[in-house]
Amino acid sequence: MSITKDQIIEAVAAMSVMDVVELISAMEEKFGVSAAAAVAVAAGPAEAAEEKTEFDVILKGIGANKVAVIKAVRGATGLGLKEAKDLVESAPAALKEGVSKDDAEALKKSLEEAGAEVEVK
């Protein structure tokens, strides 16, 4: 009489952690394989979920106070008056690209205080 997969799973589920570790070691030795390879493959997708380090600040809208938004854009980007005005009027537009999270959040806060609608991507 052979043992079914369900019986094996139930037996492993009833084992202590130390017993499972010993079982894995014995299986590695018996079949000449390593359980570490399976762990490395499973860990691969987790690396893709790294936290983003560079952000883009997008001006979505200028709100009611266009002059204040232009001043805020000039201060943040170092553009001249005409360039800043053109950028603000072309919203939605990227203000800064590839900046750190802290810089992006600070820029977003200053522009929102001026009345702009801003998105950080």
Curated annotation (Swiss-Prot):
Q: What family does the Swiss-Prot or TrEMBL record give for this protein?
A: Belongs to the bacterial ribosomal protein bL12 family.
One GO molecular-function annotation for this sequence? mRNA binding
Q: What does this protein do?
A: Forms part of the ribosomal stalk which helps the ribosome interact with GTP-bound translation factors. Is thus essential for accurate translation.
**Keyword Ribonucleoprotein recorded:** yes
Classification via CDD domains: Ribosomal_L7_L12 (cd00387)
Species of origin reads Enterobacter sp. (strain 638)
Signal peptide span per the entry?
none
Q: Tell whether Aminoacyl-tRNA synthetase is among the UniProt keywords.
A: no
- Name of the protein in its database record: Large ribosomal subunit protein bL12
Identify one Pfam family in the record.
Answer: Ribosomal_L12
User: InterPro entries of this UniProt entry?
Assistant: Ribosomal_bL12, Ribosomal_bL12_C, Ribosomal_bL12_C/ClpS-like, Ribosomal_bL12_oligo, Ribosomal_bL12_oligo_N_sf
- GO BP annotations listed: translation
Source gene? rplL
**Gene3D superfamilies membership:** 3.30.1390.10, Single helix bin
Q: What are the alphabetically sorted keywords of the record?
A: Ribonucleoprotein, Ribosomal protein
- Subunit-structure text: Homodimer. Part of the ribosomal stalk of the 50S ribosomal subunit. Forms a multimeric L10(L12)X complex, where L10 forms an elongated spine to which 2 to 4 L12 dimers bind in a sequential fashion. Binds GTP-bound translation factors.
Which superkingdom is the protein from? Bacteria
